[in-house]
Design a protein with these regions (language model features):
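Amphipathic alpha-helical interaction segments
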Residues: 11, 30-34, 51, 55, ...
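Alpha-helical phosphate/pyrophosphate-handling elements in metalloenzyme active cores
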Residues: 1-18, 30, 39, 43-51
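Hydrophobic, well-structured mid-protein blocks that either form specific transmembrane helices
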Residues: 47, 51-87
Length: 184
């Protein structure tokens, strides 16, 4: 939410749409609901109706929620808006850098995944369904998603922030492999 507001300062956006989307986009996240992508938008819509938000704002927020996530594969994004660009950049930035690394290993632990297994290569050609069902080690996630995000950023501010976080993750991986091999 804070990152979305920060990026929004440099863009011409409806700040209410940005803030609501940033706050609600992970409500009932599909990865915690057996991949069901309809629960989050339904819950967000129901909540927004309790606030007496205008229908056009609700519809815009829901479209953002439906289109924000990285889903793997080569699926093209069909809905576009500057508000989506801002919130999507903020969401992607959450996956990068120090916090992104912490989240990666936290989720990997939740899913009982290995931290690293050098015999399991990263798969950069997964379909959306394969990505959602992947049980690969957490380190693979860096190559299958995290290190790809910098090139997917939408806004100039998001790109600049992503570059710093991307570099940090590359340094982290270099350190990780040195420690894994016992050379550092």
């Amino acid at each position: 939410w804070k990152t979305a507001k920060y990026i929004a300062k440099t863009e011409q956006v409806d700040l209410l749409v940005v803030e609501l989307s940033a706050l609600l986009h992970d409500i009932a996240d599909s990865k915690f609901h057996d991949g069901d992508e309809s629960i989050g938008p339904q819950k967000a819509r129901a909540f927004l109706h309790t606030l007496e938000i205008e229908d056009n704002v609700i519809n815009h927020v829901i479209r953002i929620i439906e289109n924000i996530s990285f889903k793997g594969g080569k699926e093209a994004q069909t809905f576009q808006s500057t508000e989506l660009d801002v919130v999507q950049d903020a969401d992607r930035l959450d996956a990068l850098g120090a916090i992104g690394i912490a989240r990666t290993f936290n989720y990997g632990g939740f899913k009982n995944r290995e931290i690293y297994n050098p015999t399991i290569p990263s798969d950069l050609n997964m379909t959306k369904e394969e990505y959602k069902k992947s049980t690969a080690p957490s380190i693979n996630h860096f190559y299958e998603k995290l290190l790809l995000l910098q090139e997917l950023m939408n806004t100039a501010t998001g790109k600049a922030m992503a570059a710093k976080r991307h570099q940090f993750m590359e340094s982290y991986l270099e350190q990780f492999y040195s420690e894994w091999e016992g050379t550092l």
